[in-house]
């Protein structure tokens, strides 16, 4: 179990300054990867091929209730006071979240004037660790606070690494409605999740020693599968690829989406993503500890005739009352379901009045709109509301400026740039731009980058 926690720590810690949404990318028509956020989007081009391993790279993560500046700011306050403020200022609904995606390959082609088919594969890492408020306070305060109860229910985490093979179809029903769906086959490389943790720790006055410590109704379970090794030296880089393509821990899911056009200038879109399940049945190691335990510590007796291993006796007594069970039973894990919705109004001088050739269904130079996003997490639903402004500059550059209110802040400014030089599409997207000069002040940020080759042809 310790090895699992070490692995998750090294995966999560480098990214805890990033945020969890893709609102700059959503409904960005020029970019093929928008099809992964809404399979029913009005994608306007005829063919695309993603540059292998570079078509879509995104890193998103965040920490609610905490940023590095809160602790390390040079403001004259004691760092001990600042750490104390953080420890007692956060609660069990605060979380550390990271999501990373790497587009391994992606292809899209227009089957007819009304149908577009796309398929590909990407790798995804998603993890959420909730702040175990009582446990952190226990370690900070020590065990001498009499009769103060500390709950272990706040110890919750979920993490997974998986490969996703997908294929989707976008169908234009009529001039006003476009719908789409995407089938996903999951291959889990690693999964770890806690389940129904409960129990209470408190300290009372002892009879033999000063204090007596009590662990009551303790029941903790962590389920793991996939790339978990008893010895880290057993891991080989080839294991990552082998697991991804072996489908030893398979799953299935789907996305649905639509775009409804009320007029030439007014659009409404929506999508639901990752309605899916993974069956974890290979390399399953689940650990459960259950029981009650009371101790007044170790009472030392000095006798020249008896040599006693007090520590061994203590550990044996502990494990006899709190036995660790290792299970290999398969279990199911569910993908975090996501919902997107948007309203967009286009205006300004149309493309064709300046003699530019436009391949898009929306010929106007400017767009404004509103987006909503939510994702289902183990304890709380997370939300994001975004205002955006889009602007085209000629036929080669498109920009998108966003302002978001989310679970992390009320001042998230994002910017997206998408260029097209001949068939080459390059895009760069980022948010939390207000904190570029001092990223330590940000609770969240995200970065996305990709290169695609886009081609068009006319259908009769």
Region locations from a protein language model:
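The feature marks either
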Residues: 14, 123, 140
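Proline-rich low-complexity regions
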Residues: 14, 39, 336-338
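Bacterial Sec-dependent N-terminal signal peptides
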Residues: 1-23, 455, 460
């Amino acid at each position: 179990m310790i090895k699992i926690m070490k692995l998750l720590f090294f995966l999560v810690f480098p990214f805890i300054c990033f945020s969890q949404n893709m609102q700059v990318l959503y409904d960005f028509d020029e970019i093929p990867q928008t099809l992964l956020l809404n399979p029913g989007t009005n994608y306007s081009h005829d063919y695309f091929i993603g540059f292998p391993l570079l078509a879509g790279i995104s890193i998103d993560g965040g920490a609610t209730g905490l940023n590095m500046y809160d602790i390390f700011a040079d403001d004259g306050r004691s760092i001990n006071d600042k750490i104390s403020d953080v420890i007692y200022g956060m609660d069990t609904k605060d979380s550390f979240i990271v999501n990373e995606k790497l587009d391994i390959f992606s292809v899209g082609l227009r089957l007819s004037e009304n149908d577009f088919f796309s398929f590909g594969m990407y790798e995804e890492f998603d993890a959420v660790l909730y702040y175990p408020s009582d446990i952190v306070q226990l370690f900070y305060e020590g065990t001498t606070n009499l009769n103060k109860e500390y709950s272990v229910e706040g110890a919750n985490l979920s993490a997974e690494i998986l490969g996703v093979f997908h294929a989707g179809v976008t169908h234009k029903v009529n001039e006003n409605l476009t719908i789409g769906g995407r089938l996903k086959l999951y291959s889990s490389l690693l999964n770890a999740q806690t389940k129904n943790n409960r129990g209470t720790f408190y300290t009372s006055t002892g009879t033999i020693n000063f204090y007596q410590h009590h662990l009551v109704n303790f029941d903790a379970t962590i389920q793991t599968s996939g790339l978990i090794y008893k010895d880290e030296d057993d891991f080989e880089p080839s294991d990552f690829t082998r697991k991804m393509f072996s489908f030893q821990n398979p799953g299935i899911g789907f996305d649905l989406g639509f775009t409804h056009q009320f007029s030439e200038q007014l659009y409404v879109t929506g999508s639901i993503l990752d309605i899916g399940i993974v069956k974890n049945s290979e390399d399953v190691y689940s650990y459960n500890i259950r029981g009650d335990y009371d101790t007044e510590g170790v009472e030392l007796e000095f006798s020249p005739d008896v040599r006693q291993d007090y520590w061994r006796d203590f550990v044996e007594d502990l494990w006899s009352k709190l036995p660790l069970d290792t299970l290999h039973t398969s279990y199911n894990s569910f993908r975090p379901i996501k919902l997107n919705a948007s309203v967009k109004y286009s205006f300004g001088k149309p493309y064709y009045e300046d003699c530019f050739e436009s391949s898009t269904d929306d010929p106007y130079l400017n767009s404004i709109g509103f987006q909503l996003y939510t994702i289902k997490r183990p304890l709380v639903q997370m939300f994001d509301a975004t205002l955006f402004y889009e602007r085209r500059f000629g036929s080669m550059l498109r920009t998108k400026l966003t302002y978001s209110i989310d679970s992390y802040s009320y001042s998230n400014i994002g910017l997206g740039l998408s260029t097209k030089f001949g068939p080459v599409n390059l895009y760069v997207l980022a948010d939390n731009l207000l904190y570029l000069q001092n990223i330590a002040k940000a609770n969240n940020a995200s970065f996305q980058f990709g290169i695609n080759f886009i081609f068009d042809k006319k259908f009769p």
